[in-house]
């Protein structure tokens, strides 16, 4: 029997078309899996090659001192002392705090859990009449902060403090997601440079939150 006859012989089993299609699809899937495995990268793998996004815009802000509260977050000696930018920012923070008080703005202080308000840096220490709450990074959790703000008819909050990636990020986010307008002077939040950078980027770009947050500087804020 020659090759042609062999090819036409009924002794050679045929493969139904549907099975051929299944085999073809399986082959494509296997190839895709192999290529995907070879090229898959995580953000950690690509870390060194990620390009820094453009800096967010700092905007001028005019505030109503009657409906705006200044949140002074974790300006504790042990927090600020280990962050050089926090120490360097104190004169500007004090000047802004003095201006806010002079305009009759509500000022609320926050400390870390079990923190002692007496450990607040003396340059920016609270007066006897200013409310104080104590919590972790999100100062709304297990505190009266939300009630304090609502009872005073507050519509906007200014969040400053240390650390930028701790109390400022979490409290600003919590305020925005609760419906308050949030103003963040970037020269009033402190940590190390990278964490300040990603905090500013997150606040300016996060879904929902970005519509509530305005990044600014102390000198761009008008009372």
Regions found by a protein language model. Give the residues of each.
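Bacterial N-terminal signal peptides that target proteins for export
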Residues: 3-25
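Short acidic, Gly/Ser-rich segments with clustered Asp/Glu that frequently serve as metal-coordination loops
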Residues: 76-81
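Bacterial N-terminal signal peptides
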Residues: 23-34
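Short hydrophobic beta-strand that contains or immediately precedes a catalytic carboxylate
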Residues: 71-73
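Von Willebrand factor
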Residues: 97-115
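Active-site-adjacent betaalpha module
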Residues: 2, 40-69, 114-223
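Long, contiguous secondary-structure blocks with strong helical propensity
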Residues: 34, 38-40, 87-88
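…and closely analogous acidic/polar surface helices at protein-protein or active-site interfaces
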Residues: 83-100
């Amino acid at each position: 029997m020659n090759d042609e006859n062999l090819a036409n012989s009924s002794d050679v089993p045929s493969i139904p078309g549907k099975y051929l299609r299944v085999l073809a699809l399986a082959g494509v899937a296997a190839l895709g899996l192999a290529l995907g495995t070879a090229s898959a990268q995580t953000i950690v793998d690509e870390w060194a090659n990620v390009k820094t996004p453009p800096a967010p815009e700092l905007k001028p802000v005019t505030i109503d001192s009657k409906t705006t509260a200044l949140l002074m977050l974790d300006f504790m000696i042990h927090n600020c002392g280990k962050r050089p930018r926090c120490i360097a920012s104190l004169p500007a923070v004090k000047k802004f705090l003095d201006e806010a008080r002079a305009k009759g703005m509500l000022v609320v202080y926050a400390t870390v859990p079990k923190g002692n308000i007496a450990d607040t840096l003396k340059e920016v220490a609270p007066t006897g009449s200013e409310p104080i709450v104590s919590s972790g990074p999100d100062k709304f959790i297990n505190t009266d902060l939300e009630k304090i703000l609502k009872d005073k008819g507050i519509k906007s909050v200014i969040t400053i403090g240390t650390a930028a990636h701790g109390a400022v990020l979490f409290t600003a986010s919590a305020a925005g997601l609760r419906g308050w307008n949030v103003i963040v002077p970037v020269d009033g939040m402190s940590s190390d440079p990278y964490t300040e950078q990603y905090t500013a980027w997150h606040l300016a770009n996060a879904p929902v939150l970005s519509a509530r947050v305005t990044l600014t500087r102390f000198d761009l804020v008008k009372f």
